[in-house]
């Protein structure tokens, strides 16, 4: 019997989340569950950076949602070479 690793060929995409409120939770859950809705996908999400103006909210959001790093400066996410997608979930008046 030969075991084949189907995850080895699926590239990861680095996600940066700008904002840490309800929509950050909702979007993160969506990324986590995309395969359960659509089946096999050509990528696997990697939760790289969460940004929020409040350091406390950024830290707590990153910890609770599973992001590897956090920042209080959204520009850090834009210039990070590990980021493929920037998801802006700030309040409407901020985007």
What function would you assign to each model-found segment?
Residues 54-56, 65-95:
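Beta-loop-alpha module in the N-terminal Rossmann-like domain of NAD(P)-dependent dehydrogenases
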Residues 1-65:
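N-terminal Rossmann-like dinucleotide-binding module
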